[in-house]
Amino acid sequence: LGYILYPGCLSSTDQYQYELSAVNVLKSLNVDFSYAENVNCCGLPLRSINSYGWVYLSARLMSVLEGYGKPCILLCNWCHASLTYVKKLLDEDEALRSWVNSLLEREGLKYKGDLNFKHIIQLLYEDIGLEKLRSNVKRGFKGFKFSIHPGCLYFRPNDIGRPDDSHEPHMLMDLVKILGADAELCLDCCGWSIYNTNANTGLTLAGSRLKLASKTDGIVIACPHGGVMMDKNYEEACKVSGFKGDVPVLYYTQLLGLAIGLSPRDVALNLNKSPVNLLIGKFGI
């Protein structure tokens, strides 16, 4: 049946290198997928302002995706957390579900609650599997060491059910190791959650996270919000925090793409703002 792809707002705009690298990696691995249409934001940015608006947007998105009858691939930790949380609310609150469906009915939509959705890291780990990925590696990263940054919402909060273990998240770490690299896990926040209300504090946290990875070959991420804070805002984070090192920041889909034979442009490393040229140079391409 294949999959339906919902990149999310941030990956389709600000962090376009994530979407581009994910699409080219999926194609290279012969994953059958198509883009979802008539979709909207997951609504999570609205949660603290209008919780009903948030619930409605996530419910609408799920109802549209349900219509494809296929499992859905998500790129964003926030989208995955939002859909998981709202699904739990709607499945447990019949009155809330009825209210949502009364609004969706105006568009001929209905929330059923049977959408199967996975973060792309889950898809790579569970559906494709480590062995198949390892067999596709053309040039590994032996001799490299990476700092692993799954992102807060990939494994928290555990009361709504997250893709990875909330105490010892391992999926992204394992996926990096099959490429031949050493890896160390870091669970510190990138600073996004406070960035929009206190930019300096957010950038300080991002800079602190970069400093923790200063003795590695780079930070491997799987969340577009981490990409904004540590890659797009790299220079600002270094300036505000006083960090003076050089730490490439890239998505796992970009790292995997290089390992399976894609070019730096195929995985859109030209769109990264952190010093990824250091990584490309050491990799020798």
Protein language model regions, located:
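Iron-sulfur cluster-binding electron-transfer modules in prokaryotic oxidoreductases
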Residues: 1-285
